Amino acid sequence: MDKQSSAGGVKRSVPCDSNEANEMMPETSSGYSDPQPAPKKLKTSESSTILVVRYRRNFKRTSPEELVNDHARKNRINPLQMEEEEFMEIMVEIPAK
């Protein structure tokens, strides 16, 4: 079989699996279907969206005496190490028409 070039310029001696002769190609539309009308544009006031975003952090301060891990002391962690719990809530409201 002749060598074929791929997109990367590397010569291949066998065709790709997707080029098998028994593979069926999906049929495309012939273009004779009725065209769909373009969606009607709404006024800005009717299509407004309200986003409410809430973000909260809880900080737990750890004093140097509470740091028991020697590895943490070797890495010079800030004496007031902060552990934070975070969450984000996003709510989308679409006004009724």
From Swiss-Prot:
Task: Report motif location: Nuclear localization signal.
Answer: 37-45
**Region annotation Disordered: where it falls in the sequence:** 1-46
| Source species of the chain | Homo sapiens (Human)
Going by the entry's taxonomy, the superkingdom of the source organism is recorded as Eukaryota
Family classification: Belongs to the SPAN-X family.
**Which UniProt keywords are listed?**
Cytoplasm, Nucleus
Q: Which Pfam families does the UniProt record give?
A: SPAN-X
Protein's gene: SPANXD
Q: Which InterPro entries did the record assign?
A: SPAN-X_fam
Tissues/organs with expression: Detected in testis, sperm and a melanoma cell line.
One Gene Ontology CC term in the entry: nucleus
Per UniProt, subcellular location reads as: Cytoplasm; Nucleus
What is the protein named?
A: Sperm protein associated with the nucleus on the X chromosome D
